[in-house]
């Protein structure tokens, strides 16, 4: 469950390490984002020589949340950290690698490029 001012790890190789959620996209009263939702974020920590710099405003898709997600079969899945992957305007990842597992819910939201790059889909 991600809301405004939430800090997230970045799970790709764009150069950003941490981002801060500025806005949850999807309507003016939308408060929370879960796995597969798109947010607008500000880069708070970045490594030198990366694609994005500190202070950049980026679009990102949430790939892992500490808050558990209920699945249709009744099972739950939760991760040890909140993480996002930076995307472009066409919902394709800006980076060329994805680090760590991603949730299966991304497949239902048509983030196929992220699914194919991820080392593990849970």
Curated annotation (Swiss-Prot):
* Gene Ontology BP annotations: translation
The record's keywords, sorted A to Z, are: Ribonucleoprotein, Ribosomal protein, RNA-binding, rRNA-binding
**Any one of the GO CC terms:** cytosolic large ribosomal subunit
Presence of the UniProt keyword Glycosyltransferase in the record: no
SUPFAM superfamilies membership = Ribosomal protein L14
Molecular functions per Gene Ontology: large ribosomal subunit rRNA binding; structural constituent of ribosome
Question: Record's family?
Answer: Belongs to the universal ribosomal protein uL14 family.
Protein function: Binds to 23S rRNA. Forms part of two intersubunit bridges in the 70S ribosome.
**Oligomer and partners:** Part of the 50S ribosomal subunit. Forms a cluster with proteins L3 and L19. In the 70S ribosome, L14 and L19 interact and together make contacts with the 16S rRNA in bridges B5 and B8.
Stated name of the protein: Large ribosomal subunit protein uL14
Q: Which organism is it from?
A: Syntrophomonas wolfei subsp. wolfei (strain DSM 2245B / Goettingen)
Taxonomic lineage of the native organism: Bacteria, Bacillati, Bacillota, Clostridia, Eubacteriales
Q: Give the gene that encodes this protein.
A: rplN
């Amino acid at each position: 469950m991600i809301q405004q001012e939430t800090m997230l790890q970045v799970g790709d190789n764009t150069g950003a390490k941490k981002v801060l959620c500025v806005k949850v996209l999807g309507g003016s009263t939308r408060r929370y984002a879960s796995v597969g939702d798109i947010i607008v974020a500000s880069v708070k920590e970045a490594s030198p020589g990366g694609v994005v710099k500190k202070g950049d405003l980026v679009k990102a898709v949430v790939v892992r949340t500490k808050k558990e997600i209920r699945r249709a079969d009744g099972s739950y899945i939760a991760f040890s950290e909140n993480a996002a992957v930076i995307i472009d305007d066409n919902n394709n990842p800006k980076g060329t690698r994805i680090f760590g597992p991603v949730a299966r819910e991304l497949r239902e939201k048509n983030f196929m490029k992220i699914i194919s790059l991820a080392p593990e889909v849970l």
